[in-house]
Amino acid sequence: MATKKTIEKATTKPVKAATKTTATKATKATKEPKTVPVEKIQEIADQAAQAQTPAAPAPGQVQVNVDFLKTTKVHIAMPCYGGMLTESTFMSFIKWANTARQLGIDWTLETMVNESLISRARNTLTAKFLDMPDATHLFFVDADIGWEPWHLLVLLNRDVDVIGGLYPMKTMPIKWVVNGFEGAEEGPDGLQEVSKAGTGFLLMKKHVFEKLKSHPAVKQYKNDIGLDPKFDQHLKTYFDTAVRQNRYYSEDWTFCENWRDIGGKIWMDKRVLLRHSGSYVFCMENQEHLMKTVGPMFLQEQQEKFGIKFTDKDGNEIKKITAA
């Protein structure tokens, strides 16, 4: 799925004779990097999916360095249990493919179906990525995450070792799949250091895994699932569950802890707000819970921020939301 780059042949033009002076010596001009505003990227993406609503408005005054992006090759890895993915994720890839083609950005995609053990799925996908000599970044995205092309492009443009975007847990009120910590470093334009980030939308440079080999928790394991033997050398427990501080950690939390153990940093771009699709059971009990927890906060926020008044079907103002 990699894009083909067009190479233009250099042409030689005749140069008119000119009087030589010391003041008119030829100098090599410094080439300015090509940049594209994220609004333009969103416009390109929407050409492929007019009906899809963006996950979040594209931030103004933000440029991505396309010349830099062309020096990268991101390998997108998606665990896809049962071969299923959501409509939101499908539309995201349609947009991404169209945008990457028009910008001339190289990328590849690997999915894994019917692997019920998510930690082994991630380690297998990582092993295949590490066997690709020209791939520079591994990008994990889950099959239930909705995203925009500019989300991935701004993460690549950050040029840090490990960085993710914000996606909600499948709960209301919204809680984000991320953990902060006291004294965390802050960078420009919404860049924030965190202690843990979910692998549902996480970008990692290749050398991260080379460095993680030194961590005692990262161990080689046997290829007993029928993979090509060429991947054997890369089969390591980069993503595994663990018990730390008397807590049971998922494979993404453990990855983050191991990386920070050896001096690495986990970053989050707070501009990258994503969609997390899931099912919901519609019943009276859930309605009561939702109205009690979310309803009052939503009503108060909308009234305070925007002066919005909510009315019932008879036109009477609703000043308080209660469960039916």
Please give the residue ranges for each predicted region.
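N-proximal low-complexity "stem/linker" segments adjacent to membrane-targeting elements
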Residues: V38-S116
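Conserved donor sugar-nucleotide recognition element shared by glycan-biosynthetic enzymes
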Residues: I118-R122, D252
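Short beta-strand-to-loop acidic/aromatic patch adjacent to the donor-nucleotide binding site
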Residues: A135-G146
